[in-house]
Regions:
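Short alpha-helical elements
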Residues: 1-257
């Protein structure tokens, strides 16, 4: 590598955090094509995945938890796509053209798996992409919480599929019908907070990637940035009243496990 590897990573993080186009990278960083080439290389050979998974295990151990989670939370987010590319679709419910980010997180919000697919793919089909083979990676995982968008009174087939094919007990967290508008649902708020972490990286505010694999890699890089800072004792997250309340809720729920 002709350029310092740390500077290459700094350039990739600059693109992630600021949302700038690769070609607009400042001249005091490495040339944009060099940074993009290494980002693409590390996406293809699984480097981002390996680094991410190692850091996640270290964070869980540092928090006094087993590296292998036993429960998780599932959710999706539709991201508008400005560019063309692979796997672009129309989400009729959100009236958005782009891709869906399906993520599975542990009970503290750390990413376990991310799958990016066309926004036209329904929630139940997207959930199967995430849960298929998940226990091969996380053998202790037995319970997954999700919202009511994954099942309805007519079609509850995903619950049976999860038990039969994934060995997972999928538990739906219902909304309170008496409350209108936004609700903070037990367990479910954890994955929403993870989406908010990702949203602080402007590259992830929308989907700018041409390939779903690169979109998944950007999610991993965002979590790598977050977890590396956490292990180093650095605070890169805003600490307002919302974050303080979220931390209190998390501590309460973890103490009950």
């Amino acid at each position: 590598m002709a350029y310092d590897r740390r500077l290459v990573i700094d350039t990739i993080l600059y693109v992630l955090r600021t949302g700038t186009a690769w070609r607009h990278v400042p001249h005091d960083l490495v040339p944009w094509d060099v940074a993009y080439r290494w980002f693409r290389c590390w996406s293809t050979d699984g480097t981002w995945n390996r680094v991410h998974d190692l850091l996640r295990d270290l964070v869980r151990v540092a928090e006094g938890r087993d590296p292998q989670p036993s429960a998780a939370v599932l959710d999706s987010q539709t991201a508008h796509s400005h560019e063309g590319g692979e796997a672009i679709g129309w989400d009729a419910g959100k009236r958005t053209r782009g891709r869906k980010r399906h993520i599975l997180v542990d009970t503290s919000g750390l990413l376990l798996k991310a799958v990016v697919h066309a926004a036209s793919v329904q929630e139940r089909a997207g959930a199967k992409l995430v849960l298929a083979g998940i226990t091969a990676t996380f053998p202790l995982l037995g319970l997954v919480w999700a919202d009511a968008g994954y099942v309805n009174r007519v079609d509850q087939g995903l619950l049976a599929w999860a038990r039969e094919h994934a060995g997972i007990e999928l538990q739906i967290v219902p909304r309170n019908a008496d409350v209108k508008g936004f609700q903070v649902l037990p367990r479910r708020w954890v994955v929403e907070r993870t989406f908010s972490w990702l949203g602080r990286c402007r590259r992830l505010a929308r989907d700018y990637e041409r390939k779903p694999a690169h979109a998944e890699a950007m999610i991993k890089v965002a979590m790598i940035r977050l977890m590396a800072a956490r292990l180093a004792g650095e605070d890169i997250e805003p600490q307002g009243p919302i974050e303080t309340e979220a931390a209190r809720r998390l501590n309460d729920e973890l103490s009950q496990e």
